[in-house]
A protein has these predicted regions:
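HIT superfamily nucleotide-processing domains
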Residues: 1-176
Length: 176
């Protein structure tokens, strides 16, 4: 059985799909929290946020922003909630990453509130350290990959410049 988003892609119905390209889909689903709710999701099946490649995630975010502006203008919304339910613990119902843009109006009866909990100082510090250490490990890998990519781009750039210089020099040599 396919996921709901993959079925939308497969059906390719125009009333459901607002926008699509080779990487991302913007669609209205059958069951929504509010009239005009729109979902932005990658065409390729990625279950959670952490699985989505950065360039696709960036495109999803840009489209979610544009859809939000269209909801404000087209539906005269007074606000929007932009929601990502990431994983079972976050009550993700569809096993496919998506960004929900929910139009809001004052007094619409939609309750997305939760009770904040006060953390103890030691809990806060332990949480901060654990997240920072994990992030630093990931950043070291990311920075290494970025540096390697920059080196490759630099080498390509030098070759292109060299090729261009040779072309210009050859052209100049032909002048009488």
């Amino acid at each position: 059985m396919k996921c709901e988003y993959c079925e939308i892609i497969e059906r390719n119905k125009k009333p459901e799909i607002i926008y699509q390209d080779e990487e991302v889909i913007v669609a209205i689903k059958d069951l929504t929290t509010a009239t005009g709710q729109v979902t932005v999701f990658p065409r390729k099946h990625h279950t959670i946020l952490e699985m989505v490649p950065d360039n696709i995630l960036e495109k999803c975010a840009v489209l979610a922003n544009k859809v939000g502006m269209a909801i404000f203008d087209g539906l005269a919304a007074q606000g929007t909630n932009v929601v990502i339910q990431n994983g079972l613990g976050a009550e993700q119902k569809v096993p496919h990453f998506g960004i929900e843009i929910i139009p809001r109006r004052e007094g619409d009866g939609i309750d997305l509130q939760w009770e904040p909990k006060q953390m103890r100082e030691d809990e806060l510090e332990a949480t901060l350290i654990a997240i920072k250490e994990s992030l630093e490990k990931k950043e070291e890998i990311k920075i290494k990959n970025i540096d390697e990519s920059k080196e490759k781009d630099k080498d390509k750039g030098n070759k292109k410049k060299s090729d261009k210089d040779n072309y210009i020099l050859k052209s100049l040599r032909r002048l009488p």
